[in-house]
Regions:
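Copper-binding active sites and cupredoxin-like electron-transfer domains
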Residues: 1-239
Length: 239
């Protein structure tokens, strides 16, 4: 069981820069939900926002009534109320969650998070280090604290896990580690990812794990809007 509380939050995007956002459980991006393939999960969502909301489980295969699309498969969660989502995790992989209610406001304010479903077999696609990066973008005027809403492409702050360079957390590994990096993109534009000094293999997409025979080597990869990619490499260089 998990409990998400949709609420206003404060987030330090960079040293000394505080933004007034919306998120989950006091943070934006929201907490990462982790479970195992085959689990049945029950997720309580409490709405402490000034308007109705939903949670859409982006990429997960589940019943329509649990998909969290406001006005289509879900009436929305009114302010002050709690809704319970419950569904089975039928495949492993990397997924995301976000509202499908007043998206141009709620997602622009930072409401999103990652959802990782680990394989039932712990030996399948095993790595030594496993990192998550959520790409998000904001439009915040200098000297202000609240993002502009209803913005399609005029973002001025690009964040990794809601942190701005150079205050992004480093990926710390040991030499020789097999490393996986999972990247989800909930901005409004495609985003290329490049690893300086390394090549890697793309091992997972939105559709699932890529068989070893189909994995391809890369030094840069484009992450489409609303998509996820995972890549792996061996950390055989110091620095």
């Amino acid at each position: 069981e998990f409990h998400l509380v949709a609420e206003p939050v404060e987030r330090e995007l960079a040293d000394g820069m505080i933004a007034h956002l919306w998120g989950y459980n006091g943070q934006s991006t929201g907490p990462t939900i982790e479970a195992v393939e085959g689990d049945r999960v029950r997720i309580y969502v409490t709405n402490k926002l000034p308007e109705h909301t939903t949670v859409h489980w982006h990429g997960l295969i589940l019943p329509s009534g649990m998909d969290g699309v406001g006005g289509l498969s879900h009436p929305g969660i009114p302010p002050g109320k709690t809704y319970v989502y419950e569904f089975d995790l039928i495949k492993s992989g990397t997924f995301m969650y976000h509202p499908h209610a007043d998206e141009m406001v709620q997602m622009a304010m930072g409401m999103m998070g990652m959802f990782v479903v680990h394989p039932k077999d712990p030996a399948f696609m095993r790595v030594d280090r496993d990192f998550l990066i959520m790409l998000n973008a904001y439009d915040i005027d200098p000297g202000t604290y609240v993002p502009r809403i209803m913005t399609m492409a005029d973002f001025n702050l690009w964040t990794w896990n809601s942190r701005i360079f150079p205050d992004i957390d480093p990926l710390v590994v040991n030499r020789g580690d097999k490393v996986r990096v999972r990247v989800g993109n909930l901005t409004m534009t495609n985003h290329p990812i490049h690893m300086h000094g390394y090549h890697f293999k793309v091992t997972c997409t939105d559709g699932g794990w890529v068989p070893e025979s189909a994995q391809w080597p890369e030094v840069s990869i484009d992450i489409p809007v609303g998509a996820m990619r995972a890549y792996e490499f061996t950390a055989d260089h110091l620095g």
